[in-house]
From Swiss-Prot:
GO terms for cellular component: cytoplasm. Cell wall formation. It catalyses: UDP-N-acetyl-alpha-D-muramate + L-alanine + ATP = UDP-N-acetyl-alpha-D-muramoyl-L-alanine + ADP + phosphate + H(+). ATP binds at residues 110-116. Pathway: Cell wall biogenesis; peptidoglycan biosynthesis. The keyword Cytoplasm applies. Pfam families: Mur_ligase (PF01225), Mur_ligase_C (PF02875), Mur_ligase_M (PF08245). Keywords: ATP-binding, Cell cycle, Cell division, Cell shape, Cell wall biogenesis/degradation, Cytoplasm, Ligase, Nucleotide-binding, Peptidoglycan synthesis. HAMAP family: MurC. One of its GO terms (biological process) is regulation of cell shape. This is UDP-N-acetylmuramate--L-alanine ligase. Belongs to the MurCDEF family. NCBIfam families: murC.
């Protein structure tokens, strides 16, 4: 029997994906959010899911209510009304923890690479067998007949603790979310607690000594480039068309693979997926076949070409992610100037990682910075400004605004890499409009 679900904060990346998945499984789905456009709403609108403005009038006792993790009674009128009336509701991660028990579940955790790896795993498995999935780019697929469920496990505020998957990949650990985690040890403890809940197999990046401290009742398989790992990527060829490599398990070759993706991090992500599916007994020939057709996930190295100008959009908002994205850009466009346009995301992260951001951005040939995008969870107390970051970058750097991105035109034969988790896409759109207007004026 179908239920009616109401999502408080339906435009959130995880929430929108879950809403789409439940909609495809035959349930009635609606939700509420702010009026501001967010990239996830396109998929919801295409599916015919109703998006309402926040209002207590949206709430009734017969609804199954799922609330986004950022919302509290003091900042959301709907949640305040739900609590006042004594209605039942679940947080996103609580609902997901219960929901996934009906499937064989495959989680992807890690400080970086979660969304890309989840997308790759879901793409391969859904093309082999009926699979439901939930990806952090706002994409979800639900099937009532699916045996498998692939999902992204978010470490922020330990939201992944309700999850008890059969299998999980852990791509890496790194210090991030300084508004919540106290340091790297706190991050490690969260991942270690999550790992203990995995039931049948853990697939962990093997070249980080800290990750070798993770313990679990489930068997642990390490993957990477070095011979000390269980699953090893070897004979790697990186070209402008992607990456080719072989994977060995216990020193025996299990297949040759190609991924149409760029950067060493994507070879590691693919190796993790291959390892997980190999241990599950999935045919490696089928895995190789479907790896070749992966087209990526939203806002992860998303490319477009406007009048011969290459523009890349990426969600990178941590120094490690910036380095990986710029490495990927250099692999695909080795003869072009790499121009980075970056919007720092949250004041707390910018303060905590200021030197690391400067080092990462200095891997580009030129850097342009947008004003810091503050989180709804914090206030700007003036401790850090984007100019502080600009002063530490060793390459040419400048500031841009949405109203004036014309300094970006001072480059020939360039690739423009827009990075950030805030509203960096507004800057990208502004640049695209500028290019379009220039073309019109020269015709």
């Amino acid at each position: 029997m179908s239920k009616t679900y109401h999502f408080i904060g339906i435009k959130g990346s995880g929430m929108s994906a879950l809403a789409l998945m439940l909609h495809q499984m035959g349930h009635n789905v609606q939700g509420s959010d702010v009026d501001k456009y967010y990239f996830t709403q396109r998929g919801l609108e295409q599916a015919g899911v109703t998006i309402l403005p926040f209002s207590p009038n949206n709430i009734s006792e017969d609804l199954e209510i799922i609330a986004g993790n950022a919302f509290r009674p003091d900042n959301n009128e709907e949640l305040a009304y739900v609590i006042e009336k004594g209605y039942q509701f679940k947080r996103y991660h609580e609902f997901l923890g219960d929901f996934m028990r009906q499937f064989t579940s495959l989680g992807v955790a890690g400080a970086h690479g979660k969304t890309s790896t989840t997308g790759l795993l879901a793409h391969v498995l859904k093309n082999i067998t009926d699979t439901s999935f939930l990806i952090g780019d706002g994409t979800g697929r639900g099937s009532a007949n699916a045996n498998y469920f692939v999902f992204e496990a978010d470490e922020y505020e330990r939201h992944f603790m309700p999850y008890h998957p059969e299998y999980s990949i852990i791509t890496n650990i790194d210090f991030d979310h300084p508004d919540y985690f106290t340091g790297l040890e706190d991050v490690f403890n969260a991942f270690n607690d999550y790992a203990k809940q995995v039931q049948k197999g853990l697939f962990i990046y093997g070249e980080d000594p800290k990750l070798h401290e993770i313990t679990s009742e489930a068997p642990i398989y390490y993957y990477g480039f070095e011979d000390s790992n269980d699953f090893i990527a070897k004979d790697i060829t990186r070209t402008v068309n992607g990456s080719d490599f072989k994977v060995f398990y216990n020193q025996e070759e299990i297949g040759q693979f190609h991924v149409p993706a760029y950067g060493k991090h994507n070879i590691l992500n693919a190796t993790a997926v291959i390892a997980n599916l190999y241990i599950m007994g999935i045919d490696m020939a089928l895995v190789a076949e479907h790896l070749k057709t992966f087209s990526g996930v939203k806002r992860r190295f998303t490319e477009k070409i406007i009048d011969d100008t290459v523009i890349i959009d990426d969600f990178a908002h941590h120094p490690t992610e910036i380095i990986a994205t710029l490495d990927a850009a250099r692999q695909k466009y080795p003869s072009k100037e790499i121009v980075a346009i970056f919007q720092p995301h949250t004041f707390t992260r910018t303060i905590a990682l200021l030197d690391e951001f400067a080092h990462a951005l200095s891997q580009a040939d030129s850097v342009y910075l947008a004003q810091i995008y503050g989180s709804a969870r914090e206030v700007d107390n003036g401790e850090v400004k984007v100019e502080d970051l600009a002063a530490k970058i060793v390459k040419h750097s400048d500031l841009v605004t949405v109203e004036n991105v014309s300094p970006l035109l001072n480059h020939d034969n360039a690739v423009y890499v827009f990075m950030g988790a805030g509203d960096i896409q507004l800057y990208e759109r502004s640049f695209e409009e500028l290019l379009a207007n220039l073309t019109k004026n020269t015709q």
